[in-house]
Amino acid sequence: MKTILFILTFLLCENGYAQTTPSSKVFKPVELYQSNNLIVIQVSENAFVHTSYLQTNDFGNVPCNGMIVRNSNEAIVFDTPTNDSSANELIKFINEKLHCKVNAIVPTHFHSDCLGGLAAFHKQNIPSFANFSTIELTKVNNVVNPQNGFKDDLKLSLGKTFAMVNYFGQGHTKDNVVGYFPSENILFGGCLIKELDATKGYLGDANVGAWSNTVEKIKKQYPNLKIVIPGHGAIGGSELLDYTIQLFKAN
């Protein structure tokens, strides 16, 4: 089942979303790593999607996306794999195959598909950064706490460039943030952004009434995105923002 899910996701990326890098070369997504627990796909010159799996009662074995961005042998990871074992696998891949040191891990909200492997990053002395609300919610839910908090926006140095973390408002959860890689105009939307044709998914901690408005703010801030990575499913472009806005608009 995992392999089938991967192939479907990869083919959608391969056939539908070849992207243009800053050097104007067409970049087609390519699989760099696959095991039973982890997949890594390169989606641009310096951005990668990592996918791990979360067993759930309501939705089965769910593939969960995160993002890696790199520059000058440094990397930042958005969302951990779903457990410590897969997180260690990812860190090893980044160190040994991408030849990068991980500067930071950023969980984009408090659910386990974002920080289930956080302890593995801490054990390897990789600092974590999260919305203050995320830190409070991890304390309430008795899970591993991110180490460093911020309120609305955070700029993280990455080699000769940087990555941004932004809070635009409530949606999937009240604490959800997004990651943005300006040098390649890539957004990691996490669970706030849906793949095309997705259902609304888990709404147990959601603010459905605010969701569309929050995504509209993202679209206004970043109107010309080249790649958008959702928390689950296939990557795309700004049409994923449009789809998510319409999905949660009040009837």
How would you label these PLM feature ranges?
Residues 1-21:
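Bacterial Sec-dependent N-terminal signal peptides
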Residues 16-35:
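Sec-dependent signal peptide cleavage junction
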Residues 35-37, 42, 74-75, 82-83, 129-243, ...:
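Metallo-beta-lactamase
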Residues 46, 69, 79, 94, ...:
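Divalent metal-coordination and catalytic microenvironments
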